[in-house]
Structures are given as C-alpha cells and as structure tokens.
A protein has these predicted regions:
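Short helix-loop-beta junction
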Residues: 43-51, 137-141, 217-235
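Short, conserved beta-strand edge motifs with alternating hydrophobic and charged residues
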Residues: 172, 209-210, 233-236
Length: 236
C-alpha cells in the first residue's frame, strides 16, 4: 500500500478485511456510522456490508454486549463497539462474569470469542465520566485479553488478530491517536497469543514502558531527555 493511513483509517481497513473474509462476522453497538462517536473508523461499513451485519442499536450497553457474547458461544464472530468505554461498565456482567469465565468453567471446550471495542473518547466537550482509560482494571480479569495499539499498523493488525482469537478480547483505541499517520503493508495475520511487547527505541540510561497514547507522549519526552544527554529505551 503506497499511501499513508490515519490511525482511524487503519481500523477501518481492519474492519473491511474482516467483513470481506469472514461472512459470519457482525458488528453491533451505538453510533456505528457517526463521526462524532467513532471518527472515520467505521465510515460506510453499513453501505458496503449491509445493516444486517453493521447493527446500530439504541443505548443499552448490557443488551448489545450480552448479545455479542452469546453469539460467540454458538460459533459466530462478533464485535461490540462501546464509543465511550466509561459506559461499558453497564456491561460488566456479560464481559467479566460470562465471556471471561466460560472457557475456564468448561475445560476449554467452548469460549466466547467476542471482541469488545472500547474507545477512549476524552477531550473537547467530554466530562470526567467520558474520559477514562480503564485498561488496567480489565487486565486483571483472568480469561480476558486486553489490546491497546499505539501505532497505525497495530491498530489494523491487532484488530484482526483480536477477532480471529479464540479468546474474548478487549480492544482499546484512543481517539487522540486518530491523527497519527503511517504506511500500511499488506495484511499479515498475527496470532494474538504470540504477540510480545515491541522495543521501539534502544537506550542505555533509563527504560520507559508505555502503551497506547502514552507511547506517543513517551517519544516526545525522550526527545527532550536526549537533548539533556539521557539515553532512553522505549518499550511499547
């Protein structure tokens, strides 16, 4: 691919790849074609793939999440979108008590391979109840994988890997990253369970460990420290 993509456009490319190649996949949630909710990350998906597969719902986080979790238990692939992860707390039961537990309760014979997209939607007119990043909470839940891509490439490729994983996955994207741009190679299918932290920069004085938007902030901090003669290692 010989053009640059924005972070949100890379997510859109991931959705297009998945919906084109996996006919049993559907997406459900609120504001799925509203730029105010999801930027350009889902632009025209309803026109390309139909509203039977791109299902925009009334406001009921528990209902649409429970539906997606249940569909995963009967072999379907589903993505449920929460435009503000703060309100995903209304869906704690299907995520934490059902999706995350199912494989362990039944000896690994069945699992809800639902992907839960949670958007960090802070800034602008957003209040404190709209601006949280709750990734560390969910990272403590056994059976639930948590993904927070910081790069354009990872935004696409880790979305695809999340949906193709056998486990329930919480995929978190930060809207403050949407303006980042980079080139995309052809899709390479990754196995989510094999992904490791990325060494972004080598350094000899201090190590900085970051994820998502904090990786971008860390790069800026490293440039300042570099001018002071401090060499930093950055792990994403």
């Amino acid at each position: 691919m010989n053009k640059k993509y924005r972070y949100d456009e890379a997510i859109l490319e991931g959705f297009k790849f998945l919906l084109s190649n996996y006919s049993d996949l559907f997406i459900i949630g609120q504001g799925l074609w509203s730029p105010w909710y999801v930027g350009n990350s889902m632009k025209d998906l309803d026109k390309l793939f139909g509203k039977e597969r791109i299902i925009d719902t009334p406001v009921s986080e528990a209902a649409c999440t429970g539906l997606a979790v249940g569909s995963g238990l009967v072999g379907m692939k589903s993505i449920v979108v929460h435009p503000r992860m703060d309100f995903m707390l209304y869906a704690i039961d299907p995520i934490v008590n059902q999706a995350a537990k199912w494989s362990h309760m039944f000896g690994g014979k069945n699992s809800s391979n639902v992907t839960i997209r949670a958007i960090i939607n802070r800034g602008g007119e957003q209040g404190a109840q709209h601006s949280q990043s709750l990734h560390s909470w969910f990272a403590h839940i056994p059976g639930l994988r948590v993904v927070m891509p910081s790069s354009v490439k990872d935004a696409r490729d880790l979305l695809i890997a999340s949906v193709l994983s056998d486990d329930p996955v919480l995929y978190i994207d930060d809207r403050w990253l949407y303006s980042q741009e980079d080139y995309l190679n052809e899709v390479e299918i990754l196995k989510l369970s094999e992904q490791k932290p990325n060494l972004i920069m080598k350094g000899s004085d201090i190590t900085i460990v970051a994820n998502s938007y904090s990786t971008l902030l860390s790069k800026k901090a490293i440039e300042i420290l570099k001018r002071k003669g401090i060499s930093c290692e950055l792990i994403d």
